[in-house]
From Swiss-Prot:
<protein>
    <recommendedName>
        <fullName>Methylthioribose-1-phosphate isomerase</fullName>
        <ecNumber>5.3.1.23</ecNumber>
    </recommendedName>
</protein>
<feature type="active site" description="Proton donor">
    <location>
        <position position="245"/>
    </location>
</feature>
<feature type="site" description="Transition state stabilizer">
    <location>
        <position position="165"/>
    </location>
</feature>
<dbReference type="InterPro" id="IPR037171">
    <property type="entry name" value="NagB/RpiA_transferase-like"/>
</dbReference>
<dbReference type="Pfam" id="PF01008">
    <property type="entry name" value="IF-2B"/>
</dbReference>
<keyword id="KW-0028">Amino-acid biosynthesis</keyword>
<comment type="pathway">
    <text>Amino-acid biosynthesis; L-methionine biosynthesis via salvage pathway; L-methionine from S-methyl-5-thio-alpha-D-ribose 1-phosphate: step 1/6.</text>
</comment>
<dbReference type="InterPro" id="IPR011559">
    <property type="entry name" value="Initiation_fac_2B_a/b/d"/>
</dbReference>
<dbReference type="InterPro" id="IPR042529">
    <property type="entry name" value="IF_2B-like_C"/>
</dbReference>
<feature type="binding site">
    <location>
        <position position="95"/>
    </location>
    <ligand>
        <name>substrate</name>
    </ligand>
</feature>
<keyword id="KW-0413">Isomerase</keyword>
<dbReference type="InterPro" id="IPR000649">
    <property type="entry name" value="IF-2B-related"/>
</dbReference>
<comment type="function">
    <text>Catalyzes the interconversion of methylthioribose-1-phosphate (MTR-1-P) into methylthioribulose-1-phosphate (MTRu-1-P).</text>
</comment>
<feature type="binding site">
    <location>
        <begin position="52"/>
        <end position="54"/>
    </location>
    <ligand>
        <name>substrate</name>
    </ligand>
</feature>
<dbReference type="GO" id="GO:0046523">
    <property type="term" value="F:S-methyl-5-thioribose-1-phosphate isomerase activity"/>
</dbReference>
<feature type="binding site">
    <location>
        <begin position="255"/>
        <end position="256"/>
    </location>
    <ligand>
        <name>substrate</name>
    </ligand>
</feature>
<dbReference type="InterPro" id="IPR005251">
    <property type="entry name" value="IF-M1Pi"/>
</dbReference>
Length: 355
């Protein structure tokens, strides 16, 4: 039996003269969109996580570069390129861990440098490129979903899959990476249930992953982060699939804080642990995960729920947004080009990369 995917979600949409973003800070209580017309506003949207998830940030940043190009007033080519590079620097400073952000900005800068003709022609090409980046990401995610489906355990026929954070349509241009595998498995009749870690402190699993599953009528069970090991011990989980914000050349993978703990639990219970991510998430210039910059966010994410403090005064805080899962804990990395052992990605995938 197969199922269909209903209510597709597209978090970054071009509307003729502005970008519409699904405001992910308001989900699941409220579905609303934010109109972005200036590059500075796009940078703020990325920083405040109105848009989040490495691929979605990349698409948003590409549109931010186009919007920034329209704000440049000079007719001098060198001056235009210099100001556009400044727009890129502002966007890059928003989220240091997500490599797709840097990839998209650099691609837009390269297009601007290589496009001949008047400034208006460069701007037109930048818009076309941003749209291509978004369309390519949807196709990429669907390929990731299909490749992921092909390596899921054959037994049981209908699997229970655990995921951490949100690597779904909301985190990409559409369809998702880890949830792309979920969608493909659901459509193929191979999925019984998703187990979603709540993902403290921002609760992307509780707020966003469950919301996506509910939209498409995919059975989903929410658990707190500390329950993952227990669920594995009780044989409730068959496979783990997560996303990534940056993957080093050796296969070490940075993802939302808590992913490393899930990987250790999966290893202890002999469960396959897959990372699903596009080629643009792999940083071939980074030898290993030790060099991945880890964003630290405001401590209020830890000590407040809503506007209520949950701990006494005098407590100190540490709030890294990501951790790095060592390659040896990863069963395979699912990309649009296939599924690869972490140690093979440099040899088998580096020739695919493009600026």
């Amino acid at each position: 039996m197969t199922a269909s995917v209903a209510n597709p979600v597209y978090p970054v949409v071009w509307r003729g003269d502005h970008v519409e973003l699904i405001d992910q800070t308001r989900l699941p209580q409220q579905f609303s969109v934010v109109e972005i017309r200036r590059s500075e506003d796009m940078a703020t949207a990325i920083k405040t996580m109105i848009v989040r998830g490495a691929p979605a940030i990349g698409v948003a940043a590409a549109y931010g570069m186009y919007l920034g190009s329209c704000e440049v007033t000079t007719d001098n080519r060198d001056g235009f390129l210099s100001e556009l590079a400044g727009v890129g620097d502002t966007l890059k400073a928003t989220r240091p861990t997500a490599v797709n952000l840097f990839w998209a900005v650099d691609r837009m800068l390269k297009v601007a440098r290589q496009t001949l003709g008047p400034i208006s022609q460069i701007q037109d090409q930048l818009l076309t490129t941003a749209q291509e980046i978004g369309a390519d990401d949807v196709r990429t995610c669907k390929a990731i979903g299909d490749h992921g489906l092909s390596v899921l355990p054959k037994d049981p026929e209908k699997l229970c899959l655990l995921t951490h954070c949100n690597a779904g349509a909301l985190a990409t241009a559409g369809y998702g990476t880890a949830l792309g595998v979920v969608r493909s498995a659901w459509t193929a009749g191979r999925l019984a249930r998703v187990y979603a870690d709540e993902t403290r402190p921002r609760l992307q699993g509780a707020k966003l992953t469950t919301w996506e599953c509910v939209q498409e009528e995919i059975p989903v069970t929410l658990i707190s982060d500390g329950m993952a090991a227990h669920c594995m011990q009780q044989n409730l989980i068959d496979v783990v699939v997560v996303g990534a914000d940056r993957i080093a050349a050796n296969g070490d993978a940075a993802n939302k804080i808590g992913t490393y703990s899930v990987a250790l639990c999966a290893k202890a219970h002999n469960l396959p642990f897959y990372v699903a991510a596009p080629l643009s998430t792999i940083d071939f210039d980074l030898a290993d995960g030790g060099g991945i910059p880890i964003e630290e966010r405001h401590p209020s994410e830890i000590y407040q729920i809503g506007t209520t403090d949950i701990c006494p005064k005098g407590v100190e805080f540490y709030n890294p947004a990501f951790d790095v899962t060592p390659a040896e804990l990863i069963t395979g990395i699912i990309t649009e080009h296939g599924v690869f052992a972490p140690g093979d990605i440099r040899e088998k995938l580096s020739h695919h990369r493009s600026a």
